[in-house]
Swiss-Prot record:
Pfam families: Myosin_head, Myosin_TH1, SH3_1. This is Myosin-3. It is found in: Cytoplasm, Cytoskeleton, Actin patch. Residues 980-1000 have a biased composition (Basic residues). Residues 1107-1116 have a biased composition (Pro residues). The gene is MYO3.
Amino acid sequence: MAVIKKGARRKDVKEPKKRSAKIKKATFDANKKKEVGVSDLTLLSKISDESINENLKKRFKNGIIYTYIGHVLISVNPFRDLGIYTNAVLESYKGKNRLEVPPHVFAIAESMYYNLKSYNENQCVIISGESGAGKTEAAKRIMQYIAAASNSHSESIGKIKDMVLATNPLLESFGCAKTLRNNNSSRHGKYLEIKFNSQFEPCAGNITNYLLEKQRVVSQIKNERNFHIFYQFTKGASDTYRQMFGVQMPEQYIYTAAAGCTTADTIDDVKDYEGTLEAMRTIGLVQEEQDQIFRMLAAILWIGNISFIENEEGNAQVGDTSVTDFVAYLLQVDASLLVKCLVERIMQTSHGMKRGSVYHVPLNPVQATAVRDALAKAIYNNLFDWIVDRVNVSLQAFPGADKSIGILDIYGFEIFEHNSFEQICINYVNEKLQQIFIQLTLKAEQETYEREKIKWTPIKYFDNKVVCDLIEAKNPPGILAAMNDSIATAHADSNAADQAFAQRLNLFNSNPYFELRANKFVIKHYAGDVTYDINGITDKNKDQLQKDLIELIGTTTNTFLSTIFPDDVDKDSKRRPPTAGDKIIKSANELVETLSKAEPSYIRTIKPNQTKSPNDYDDHQVLHQVKYLGLQENVRIRRAGFAYRQTFEKFVERFYLLSPDCSYAGDYTWDGDTLEAVKLILRDAMIPEKEFQLGVTSVFIKTPESLFALEDMRDKYWYNMAARIQRAWRRFLQRRIDAAIKIQRTIREKKGGNKYVKLRDYGTKLLAGKKERRSMSLLGYRAFMGDYLSCNESKTKGSYIRRQVGIKDKVVFSIKGECLHSKFGRSAQRLKKVFILTKKTFYIIGQTREQNAMKYTQDYKIDVGKIKQVSLTNLQDDWMGVILVNSTQPDPLINTPFKTELMTRLKKLNEKIMIKVGPTIEYHKQPNKLHTVRSKISDSAPKYGDIYKSSTIYVRRGHPANSKSNKKPKNPGGLSGKPIKSKKSKHKSTHKHTHSHRSHRDAAKKQPLPSQKPVNPLSLAATAAQAAYNPKPDKTVPIKSSAIPAAKVSSKHSSKPSSKEKVAVKKASSSHKSSSAKQNQVSMPPSKGVEKNKEPLKETTATANIPIPPPPPPMGQPKDPKFEAAYDFPGSGSSSELPLKKGDIVFISRDEPSGWSLAKLLDGSKEGWVPTAYMTPYKDTRNTVPVAATGAVNDVTNQKSSQIDNTISSAQEGVQFGSATVGPTSDNQSNPVGTFSDGLASALAARANKMRAESADDDDNDDGDDDDDW
């Protein structure tokens, strides 16, 4: 079912604004940015990495950072604030599909939230890209949009949204740091799930943490920084914290100052510290918990300041015990035990199943420093995990979670000069994300097409599964498994473990994506080749504290420290604890499983340069990212694939409302196969066949525009149904109102007459016998309506003129005309003017064209009370002089076809105005200078105009001055004059009845409607048709037995016509002349069918004695030629025009030099002006038939009517005018139908003569029902 269109409505029915289907006025949007490049890379004319890069560069240079590849968003980091995340921008994306608005991260968020509500499926967004490309910012903006879009007045819902938003500044402070590439680089990965209740309001959340970069706590590359929280804390700590925890500035700590960078551009550490505290309060961290968090941070910073020196024996010794004492105070452990754990390592030997000896092995300064750093990293890592768990506790406080939207913000691909274990883990996770992208977009899409037997051309792409297996595989072992084996073999010596690992790497030399070098190895990732250092890599993989450090923490009296280290040391356990590599593999696989359960969206971020400059665009660097992100392959598959796919069942469940065969009043009514239901939905929604394919179990829609059309139709379904009911009800009410108004108007006219006609008659009396009259002024439909320019209405030309001139009073008369403008030494000029009359003032308005627009100015503003006289000639011209009282202005001499009405209304408003009619018009051409204009009859003057030259008006002779206006013709259709046609609904009820509905509809079209009122038949053919249905004997004619017996006629043709029999007859238009001897041209409007209460012919004696009357004179040929419309002429809406359709046949009575012709319909019902160029002479190729017989009987639908038609034609052809007997030719005499026609024509001829004579005395003008403008 397509979108239901609203039918035409009456203009006088006021509708609510919100329901208006009116097209909004087009306006220029000055804020709209010019489109640069293409907004969707699938629209590129040439698909290549270079063309993609060039398009991204164009948009970046113009401040446009977002581009689509289908439903995948490409984001280029602008390194500046573009002002595109304001509330106003956010609101503009609500409820819009991605094609209605420019590409934006808000559009992806809106699509996710809409799909969550519409399909009740979990959603997730995978944000990928290298470090510094803008992944964290994109995640924040998605959270911002979802929180704003899911508006709720519930206090609990509002609180959970605040908590979700507060996780951003909190986790950024503890998990992000400044790097060489990015000032806010995520040094951990997180997957945030926002959970929604059944009303799709956020009610809970959960955060999963992935691989915090612990090494950054103790060391950073030069010009990089530690985690943000350390600089925030040291710069913004309160005096209380400084006294309790000995907080110093960041330059005083080794962990924050060693890299030589304690500040960063665009970062305000003190302000961010306040934001972190506010986030803690929002999430629900009490003050005691906050104190303990900052106590641990202070302990970590002071642990970094512990230094070691070498004693006489070459072993490590604490350089300053005051530092260790303060650390022991912060950790609430024994100071001597702390020092012992830092400079010694406990070694335990075993003999079989028995425990061996325990040795205290002293450490050298390098080893002691490593132990110190291990303790700091362990405390920070466990503190971060505790914060994430604590946030989850707060986010899970509200039950009712049903579905979720997941946001993955994880570290990007990294390639440094020296890459170690952290980089291999980070790059491995990015490989897994790339694998998901390939599986869910490229590979899965092509496999789906093959499985569903969809026509498809396979496209080659790089599947990085081989690289993932190289790192994570167990059998055969991958790189991380080989590293675990090396640690197990040489667990006591890190150097030995590194050498063992290097030897095991020889197993991978046959792998094309691996290369071994001296103390290094290379992995060929999808993003590029990365070289990793072997030295120290196995020690980082151990990810465990020495047992003596764990035992040290177990002795603390600080309950918070005990809480973040919950596991006790199992001294008897022989099982190898999981390494960092094991944990990251497990986390990555769990992440893949979680993402696979949700409907994914993708954001691919690109970093334009390494300098973090808003103006630089490194083509080489971006081109490299375009290649390893696989954007070209993505574009190719997107252009060849389908934008949407869904199983038949879910598609029908979603869109069954769009087909009337599948639904009724919102209920699903289809009981057939779901595949057939899908076909019905697509058919009724008018989706082209090229836009979709039907697979084995699913339907595939090619373009997103088709999907958006389906969604839009579904959204409007209930509105359309409600609008349909409202439309029907309003139509019923309006018909009732219209009927009441027509009854009231008719009653008022019967009692008191029509006020407009009364005003016309009053004006006629004012000029009675004084001024010749024009033809148009005599029409019965002419009435003094007044406001012909519709100045009192809104949105009309008249109202526009009224506003421009500044007229505020109600307008009683308005019309266009001309005014004589005199120039010194030159002939007077006729200028177009507009005349507007109010109750007090008469305005003459001039018009000029300026800058291709019409401008109206006030020429005269005349007080009606200051008009002394109105002067007119006694001929039929339209000139009129307005004589003013003691005016300093010249008297206006105006020309308007409605001069009589203007004069009448002026007289009504001011009874003192004198009306002077004579052969001349006298007016003041200049103040106190009387000028005379003569009038003269001239045959060379235009038929409907005049010529003004040298103060003389030349005009043709008009109708006599004492001519009276014709009576208003009666409407042929009762009150309204038009039948009320019932509108058939276009809505199909069911598929089963479609054919029957169509056949009924076609049959109805073949049935012509009867006219509303029978008319007097004046022609022989019309009389015969009328008599065939409803013959009546003429009581004034003596009856004789010489006529053909009517019993034969009655026996064959006296039955009543059925309701489906329709007959149209013609009537002759009456002449203005009273001569009854002249035969006039016959015009035939539609005649009403015979009424049911009419009696059929009866056999009577009187009928048998009807004499044969004398035959009428021969029918005259048509006076006016016939013309055929060659084109459609809808008209401009003026009542003087006659709208035509191509092929319509009319009479042309006269042609004007202006290019217009006066045309009349064949039935004489309407007359008006048509363009001469639109008309061509009509060539009648049918057999020659008398004009009166043409169209006498139309659209008969049964055999009986057909016989009547043949009878009439036979009667007309057989009449021998001027003879005593009337009958057909000899060939027809043997035909029984001919016998009927002979008698019928003879019997009705006399009746026709009498009626023709009576109609000649009737001087009513029934020419059309136009509102002629004279």
